[in-house]
């Protein structure tokens, strides 16, 4: 219902309650252009209505006949109603004190970080920092993360986060496969590694021919393995001295990966000091809530010789055009968007926002604060060990940091029963043993409650905490010789921001350097940078969602699982498929899971030999990278002059590989921003040759409510909840990449048997460390769908298409639109061809991207899917005013280019070639350029009231890769 102007309402009497209710109010805030603006844009395009435009854009053969079947969520809820409904679900969760451990620990999120990072749109609405000049704040925060990890692990270099610890372990395995012992395909996993890590490793190893062996760590050197994974400390709490074992593994030609707890490394000798080649782990306990499994930032650190084989993003130091230090993403030629099937990993989205939180936790506490936390945790564990021994129980592990495995024998069930009565969760190690992992939130009272549980089971009296503390002198339970002596976190950034005032100002100084959605539109094609509404974000910080351990008993997570079930059904309705799994914690992992499901389907039919994956030449780089990881052979299908899949070439390739055809991976609408007219035919050709159709859901924002991959021939898709369904990009993560499948593939959806989650008996192995992946951000998408309802979700899609066509129409006289469908129309994005400009003026797409920064904009997607182009996606959330501001900037830039073409501006000394212009450059005493300072900094009048200044000049990418430096920069360099 449209909210009418109050003056018009006042003239009506009487007013009914129904007339005053505004259930659609959220949709009107989410969708940027109002009715008048939409009509003005439609007039520009020559259409009378949105419906008429959509009829012209989307092929009639694939249009949805019915309204989105959202059931109880078909009608929109107001923001208050949706929050209240979600609160009912959250209250069904039981937040126990969880001492389960197994890689997840409760933690205190410092309030200054909670409010000023996690809840701050300047951080969470930013995109991956591919444009370094407008990303210096989060690049510095991520560089801090890398420095933190490298220092604590004792290794040379760390990446800027991975998806979770289990995924990081799998990435380390494949890294060593590429670089290690050529005569072995064995990866050896010690039997005290986290069980969920082992399961993800097994999932990853099978398609690429790696044999995973498990057994005692002591036997690793005799396994003839190219790599060995050790846990430090082990899942049962043991802290073992691996120095001699590491030497033996190296002597046998193998390499060593260590899964290490970063908090423990403040007091334990780091893996790098005793010869480890790679360290991986999770930074969750550095201030990031457990969140029923995620999101959390994993890490991967390596010796220097492996740096060019690392997966994931890597922040490096370079210089800008003025020779000043600048940060950028380094060694991007390793990544999937460039190397495709030869990439080191398929990871695209990682966990930047959570890595930033973890790094700021280290900045805020500093080395002394972290060590104090670690020593206190270790002391509590030692007091617990002493107490349970007094009560007659034996501890299985004599060495420990924070985890005890306690032999409870026949009293095990009683221990769990008495713990439950005190709202405590313990780890169920076996029928005769329990595990207890304490953390920084464990208090004296908590310790007393734990002792009371064991005392009750023993039929005795719990020893007093103070008495235990007084009687236990100097016991750290760490092996002799493994106490850390090396310094860490010595850089000034970890030693100066310890007051809240200093921390607050540091965080503000970083966020002020960056350009995020809170400042302006981010028109990145294929990225869908839409509104991340505050009401959607609020539940993320509710303790009923954040305080749940991923392996908590099912009866404590009723609300979570009900919300997850509802969200899965919402996505089933949107996609037209039969079932959805929310386990994949990034789009790349959803792709990977989908391809494994296809393989499992073929294998179940006796056709495991089908391993050829057809991929159009225009595909996103994750597609071939994922296919390679899934053990498939990539065969490229040509595209025609209009950017569509070449049907003749598809038929030829399908015929050639008919016996071995596993799948085709297509994106719809295509990566060229067009609804291909023959998508049904593409699906039919592949099906006729025995293959399955994988429809990449990256562009789902152009389909919701209007068409559905499950209805036009798709068998499986992944979605990006961080695109279409409003989870923010976080500066490079978190993301969620659900996999949606047809009915015939539903029984192959992923399980996680190691933790008791079995969705389907025939399901593939786990693809994430937690059963539901990044569960704590799923409420964002639930809220979005609940507040929009069926009609408004469709309206959002239509408006996204309208906005894209409006931009294409307005800019077409200035920049050719490379691809379009019938009537010259595009889908939800358009590609502007700058190649003729390069030929006529020497101005490159990079020059235009950097010049847009001077106008206050993040550049559109550069040179994808076609080199020398810009791909623009405005989404439905941008108003006509903001679209017009972007259009005006692009037209003004075209005029600047024209001045070069006509000889009125020098081909080198012009505002594009020297962009972006910093405040320091513009205000310097000396100005040697042929153009004015005003043209450099204020090329359009609107900048006079709202000017963003890039903090650095153009970053030198070549210098940065040739002089790779990925640690924090000394203060002297900024002088």
Curated annotation (Swiss-Prot):
Cofactor(s) this protein requires: pyridoxal 5'-phosphate
EC annotation from Swiss-Prot or TrEMBL: 1.4.4.2
Taxonomic superkingdom: Bacteria
Gene Ontology biological process: glycine decarboxylation via glycine cleavage system
Enzyme kind, highest EC tier: oxidoreductase
CC terms in the record's Gene Ontology section: cytosol; glycine cleavage complex
PANTHER family, per the entry: GLYCINE DEHYDROGENASE (DECARBOXYLATING), MITOCHONDRIAL, GLYCINE DEHYDROGENASE, DECARBOXYLATING
Protein family per UniProt: Belongs to the GcvP family.
Purpose: The glycine cleavage system catalyzes the degradation of glycine. The P protein binds the alpha-amino group of glycine through its pyridoxal phosphate cofactor; CO(2) is released and the remaining methylamine moiety is then transferred to the lipoamide cofactor of the H protein.
NCBIfam families: gcvP, PRK04366.1
Protein name: Glycine dehydrogenase (decarboxylating)
Organism of this sequence: Burkholderia lata (strain ATCC 17760 / DSM 23089 / LMG 22485 / NCIMB 9086 / R18194 / 383)
Organism taxonomic ancestry: Bacteria, Pseudomonadati, Pseudomonadota, Betaproteobacteria, Burkholderiales
């Amino acid at each position: 219902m449209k909210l009418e102007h109050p003056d018009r309402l006042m003239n009506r009497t009487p007013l009914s309650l129904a007339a005053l209710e505004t259930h659609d109010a959220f949709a009107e805030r989410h969708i940027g252009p109002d009715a008048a603006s939409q009509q003005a844009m439609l007039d520009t395009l020559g259409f009378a209505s949105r419906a008429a435009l959509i009829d012209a854009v989307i092929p009639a053969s694939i249009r949805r006949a019915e309204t989105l079947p959202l059931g109880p969520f078909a009608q929109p809820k107001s923001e208050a109603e949706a929050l209240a409904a979600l609160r009912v679900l959250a209250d069904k969760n039981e937040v126990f004190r969880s001492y389960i451990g197994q890689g997840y620990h409760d933690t205190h999120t410092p309030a200054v970080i909670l409010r000023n990072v996690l809840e701050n749109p300047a951080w969470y609405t930013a995109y991956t920092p591919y444009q370094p000049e407008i990303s210096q704040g989060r690049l510095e925060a991520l560089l801090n993360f890398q420095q933190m990890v490298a220092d604590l692990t004792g290794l040379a270099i760390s990446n800027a986060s991975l998806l979770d610890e289990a995924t990081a372990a799998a990435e380390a395995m494949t890294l060593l496969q590429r670089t290690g012992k050529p005569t072995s395909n064995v990866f050896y996993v010690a039997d005290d590694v986290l069980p969920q890590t082992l399961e993800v490793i097994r999932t990853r190893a099978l398609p690429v021919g790696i044999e995973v062996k498990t057994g005692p760590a002591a036997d690793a050197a005799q396994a003839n393995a190219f790599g060995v994974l050790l846990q430090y400390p082990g899942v049962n709490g043991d802290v073992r001295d691996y120095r001699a074992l590491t030497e033996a593994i190296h002597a046998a030609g193998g390499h060593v990966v260590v899964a290490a707890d970063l908090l423990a490394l403040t007091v334990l000798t780091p893996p790098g000091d005793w010869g480890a080649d790679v360290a991986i782990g999770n930074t969750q306990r550095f201030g990031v809530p457990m969140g029923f499994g995620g999101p959390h930032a994993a890490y991967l650190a390596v010796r220097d010789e492996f740096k060019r084989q690392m997966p994931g993003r890597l922040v490096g130091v370079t210089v800008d055009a003025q020779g000043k230090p600048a940060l950028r993403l380094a060694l991007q030629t390793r990544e999937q968007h460039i190397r495709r099937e030869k990439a080191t990993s398929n990871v695209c989205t990682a966990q930047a926002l959570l890595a930033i939180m973890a790094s700021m936790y280290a900045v805020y506490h500093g080395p002394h604060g972290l060590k104090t936390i670690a020593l206190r945790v270790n002391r509590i564990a030692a007091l617990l060990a002493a107490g349970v021994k007094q009560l007659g129980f034996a501890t299985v592990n004599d060495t420990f940091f924070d985890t005890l495995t306690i032999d409870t024998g026949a009293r095990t069930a009683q221990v769990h029963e008495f713990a439950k009565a005190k709202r405590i969760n313990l780890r169920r190690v076996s029928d005769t043993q329990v595990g207890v992992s304490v953390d920084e939130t464990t208090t004296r009272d908590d310790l007393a409650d734990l002792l009371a549980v064991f005392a009750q089971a023993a039929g005795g009296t719990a020893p007093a905490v103070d008495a235990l503390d007084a009687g236990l002198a100097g016991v750290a339970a760490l092996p002799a010789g493994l106490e850390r002596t090396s310094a860490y976190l010595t850089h000034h950034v970890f030693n100066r921001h310890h007051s809240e005032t200093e921390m607050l100002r540091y965080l503000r100084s970083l966020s002020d350097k960056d350009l995020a959605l809170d400042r302006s539109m981010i028109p990145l094609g294929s990225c869908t940078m839409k509104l991340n509404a505050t009401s959607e974000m609020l539940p993320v910080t509710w303790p009923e969602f954040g305080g749940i351990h991923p392996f908590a008993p099912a009866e404590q997570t009723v609300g979570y699982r009900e919300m997850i079930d509802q969200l899965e059904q919402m996505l089933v309705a949107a996609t037209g498929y039969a079932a959805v799994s929310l386990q994949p914690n990034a789009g790349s992992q959803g792709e990977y899971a989908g391809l494994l499901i296809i393989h499992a389907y073929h294998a179940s039919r006796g056709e495991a030999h089908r391993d050829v994956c057809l991929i159009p030449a225009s595909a996103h780089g994750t597609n071939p990278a994922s296919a390679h990881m899934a053990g498939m052979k990539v065969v490229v299908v040509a595209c025609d002059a209009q950017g569509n899949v070449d049907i003749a070439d598809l038929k030829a390739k399908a015929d050639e590989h008919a016996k071995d055809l596993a799948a085709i991976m297509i994106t719809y609408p295509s990566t060229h921003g067009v609804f291909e007219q023959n998508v049904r035919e593409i699906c039919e050709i592949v099906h006729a040759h025995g293959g399955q159709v994988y429809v990449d859901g990256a562009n789902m924002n152009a389909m919701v409510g209007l068409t559905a991959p499950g209805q036009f021939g798709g068998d499986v898709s992944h979605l990006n909840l961080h695109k279409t369904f409003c989870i923010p990009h976080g500066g490079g993560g978190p993301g969620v990449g659900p996999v949606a499948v047809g009915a015939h593939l539903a029984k192959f959806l992923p399980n996680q048997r190691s933790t008791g989650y079995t969705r389907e008996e025939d399901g593939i192995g786990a693809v994430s460390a937690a059963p539901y992946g990044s569960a704590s951000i799923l409420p964002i998408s639930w809220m979005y769908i609940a507040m929009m309802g069926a009609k408004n979700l469709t309206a959002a899609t239509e408006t996204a298409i309208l906005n894209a066509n409006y931009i294409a129409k307005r800019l077409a006289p200035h920049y050719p639109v490379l691809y379009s469908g019938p009537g010259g129309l595009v889908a939800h994005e358009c590609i502007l061809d700058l190649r003729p400009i390069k030929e006529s003026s020497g101005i490159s797409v990079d020059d235009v991207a950097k010049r847009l920064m001077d106008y206050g904009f993040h550049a559109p997607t550069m040179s994808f899917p076609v080199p020398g182009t810009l791909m623009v996606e405005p989404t439905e959330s941008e108003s006509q005013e903001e679209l017009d501001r972007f259009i005006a900037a692009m037209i003004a830039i075209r005029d600047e280019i024209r001045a070069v073409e006509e000889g009125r501006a020098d081909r080198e000394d012009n505002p594009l070639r020297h962009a972006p212009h910093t405040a320091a450059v513009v205000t310097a005493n000396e100005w040697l350029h042929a153009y004015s300072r005003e043209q450099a900094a204020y090329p359009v009048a609107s900048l006079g009231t709202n000017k963003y200044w890039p903090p650095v000049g153009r970053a030198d990418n070549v210098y940065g890769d040739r002089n790779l430096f990925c640690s924090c920069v000394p203060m002297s360099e900024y002088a």
